[in-house]
Regions:
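A domain-start/cap signature at the N-terminus of enzymes
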Residues: 32-101
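Glycine-rich nucleophile elbow surrounding the catalytic serine of serine-hydrolase chemistry
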Residues: 178-185
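Amphipathic, heptad-repeat alpha-helical segments
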Residues: 1-23
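Solvent-exposed, acidic/flexible segments
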Residues: 12-19, 37, 41, 145-153, ...
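Residue in the alpha/beta-hydrolase core beta-strand immediately N-terminal to the catalytic nucleophile
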Residues: 173-175
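Active-site machinery of serine-nucleophile hydrolases
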Residues: 98-167
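Sec-exported extracytoplasmic/periplasmic mature domains
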Residues: 2-9, 27-31, 35, 53-60, ...
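Solvent-exposed, polar/charged alpha-helical surfaces in well-ordered, non-transmembrane soluble domains
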Residues: 17, 24, 28, 42, ...
């Protein structure tokens, strides 16, 4: 973590939420001992490797994750407390973004061990349960295991707004869905 932070400082780049969420997720996992097996050290390394890659790209002015296809982790700054909050996107390779596209918002089920770092790694490595054609799938993190109430609800709404600012979303075709706790959201 120190090496990534030092790299950021040496490059004199302003961290976007897209990078800050990655670094902070590992810092939180270390601070609160959120490593539940030996294999999760590799999870932290993968998240930090992506953070370092993004720092290098940002420093060179070549951010690619904004136009990436496939599984993409992004972030935004919360109006609640100013914290960087993560979300995942699934962007089909054949997406026609010249036309307004639907947005499917998938609310995850409860996961007592799904911390920021674990959520980010899942969104970097595993597609979700739905794969609509010519549409984006949004996976908000949504703080707290409370059925997307309170801060979690605001997080979902802010994720949607952030995605609408960066992608050509058809505001008449935004679908909210989920399973278990996500279905209650």
């Amino acid at each position: 973590i120190h090496d990534v932070r030092s790299n950021v400082a040496s490059k004199s780049v302003n961290l976007s939420a897209d990078i800050q969420t990655l670094i902070e997720s590992v810092e939180l996992a270390v601070e609160f001992n959120e490593f539940y097996s030996q294999g999760q050290i590799a999870v932290a390394e993968a998240v930090l490797t992506e953070a370092e890659r993004r720092v290098e790209l940002l420093a060179s002015g070549k951010q690619d994750w904004h136009q990436a296809q496939g599984l993409v982790v992004r972030g935004y700054y919360s109006s609640i407390d100013g914290s960087a909050q993560p979300y995942g996107l699934e962007i089909p390779a054949d997406l026609n973004s010249t036309k307004a596209i639907p947005l499917y918002v998938w609310l995850h089920g409860r996961g007592d061990k799904t911390t920021d770092m674990h959520f980010i790694h899942q969104r970097m490595t595993r597609a979700g349960r739905i794969a609509p054609s010519n549409a984006l799938v949004l996976h908000p993190f949504g703080r707290h295991c409370m059925g997307f109430k309170s801060a979690g609800e605001i997080d979902v709404l802010e994720c949607i707004e952030h995605v609408k600012q960066h992608y050509n979303i058809d505001t008449q075709r935004i679908v909210l869905m989920g399973f278990a706790m996500g279905g209650a959201g």
